[in-house]
Structure formats: structure tokens, C-alpha cells
Design a protein with these regions (language model features):
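Alpha-helical metal-binding/catalytic segments enriched in His/Glu/Asp
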Residues: 29-40
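Secreted peptidase-domain scaffold signal
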Residues: 73-160
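Long, contiguous C-terminal modules that act as interaction/assembly or targeting platforms
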Residues: 12, 42, 131-132
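Extracellular S/T/G-rich loop segment that most often corresponds to the catalytic His/Ser-adjacent loop
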Residues: 1-27, 31
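Noncatalytic accessory or regulatory domains flanking protease catalytic cores in secreted, cell-surface
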Residues: 165-175
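An often Trp-containing, charged/polar helix-loop segment at the C-terminal end
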Residues: 41-66
Length: 175
């Protein structure tokens, strides 16, 4: 496969039509999306929520040939949808937003994940789940390549049995 570069149409310094590539071309579009989402939400400004909604809506073009395992590293998280499609789900999808603050060492276990009964077939849940995690990491530029001082892991799966946990302990949360 041959790599084909498709640039963004713009204007050169002398006013002529030009094309170019780079992340800075996405800045005006993402800024407009963020402003549109904020206006549509009509609530206190929450940059992490807006970032999460934009990122969650992004997808790759069908003709994308970059391997799935390399996409985020090579081309980012994809192309975000427009504001109405970000804010309003289709009739066959739902978006669950969980917001909280975690102190160092804390964890959240969601043991009763709200799955609609219509997705239950022969004792198994069917459907697609897309999880998007957005957080505000602790950054320390003096730490070189380890400047990001926050690591969060997301694990999704099922248990054979459900065990009740003592959620009164400081480091265990179950919203």
C-alpha cells in the first residue's frame, strides 16, 4: 500500500489556494465544536466533559487502512461528529456519563452496570460498548519522559459471581 496524503484546503501567504497537513488545521473545527457543545449544554463550563464528548464521538473513515492497533498513535482518535450528533443519540444507542474525582490510590468498581434488558439474549448481553476515559492528569515537567504523573486503567468484563464489597473504605467507590 502506498500512502496518500490529502491536505486541508487553505490559502498561502500570497493569497493563492494551497493544501497542507498538520494538527493545527483541526484547531478551528474542534474549537467550534467545543463552543457549540457548551452552548447546547447550557451548564457550567466543564472542559473535561466537552473533551470527552468530542473524543467519544470521533471515528475513523471507512477507507482507513492504518491498522487498528496503530490508529491512535498515527492519526489520533478520528474525526468527531457534528454538535447535534454528539449531543443527541440515535434511537438505538445510549451514552452514560460518569463524572467523579479520584484521589491517588482510589478505584471505582461499577458492579451494577445499567444494561437494557432488550440486549439480553439466551442469558448473554449483546451489543457494542465503547468506553471513553478523559482525565486531567498531574503533570510534572521536571520528570522528563515521565512528566505525566497519573495513570488510569479501565477494565471491562464480567464476573462469575458478584461479591459485595465494603464501599465505606476510603479507596473503594461504587457509584
Amino acid at each position: 500500500g502506498e500512502t496518500v496524503t490529502t491536505g486541508v484546503k487553505s490559502f498561502s501567504k500570497d493569497g493563492k489556494m494551497a493544501t497542507g497537513v498538520g494538527t493545527s488545521f483541526s484547531t478551528p473545527r474542534v474549537t467550534a465544536l467545543a463552543a457549540g457543545i457548551q452552548q447546547e449544554l447550557s451548564e457550567e463550563f466543564d472542559p473535561l466533559l466537552i473533551k470527552a464528548l468530542i473524543t467519544h464521538s470521533a471515528s475513523y473513515p471507512k477507507e482507513m487502512t492504518v491498522p487498528v492497533t496503530e490508529r491512535a498513535k498515527q492519526v489520533g482518535f478520528g474525526i468527531p461528529k457534528n454538535v447535534p450528533d454528539i449531543i443527541y443519540n440515535s434511537p438505538y444507542e445510549a451514552t452514560l456519563i460518569l463524572r467523579d474525582s479520584l484521589a491517588k490510590g482510589d478505584k471505582i468498581d461499577i458492579m451494577d452496570f445499567p444494561m437494557p434488558q432488550c440486549l439480553l439474549k439466551d442469558g448473554y448481553y449483546t451489543g457494542q460498548i465503547i468506553a471513553t476515559l478523559v482525565y486531567d492528569p498531574v503533570l510534572d515537567p521536571s520528570q522528563g519522559i515521565e512528566y505525566c504523573q497519573s495513570n488510569i486503567d479501565v477494565k471491562f468484563g464480567s464476573y462469575d459471581t458478584k461479591e459485595e464489597r465494603d464501599t465505606s473504605k476510603r479507596h473503594i467507590l461504587n457509584p
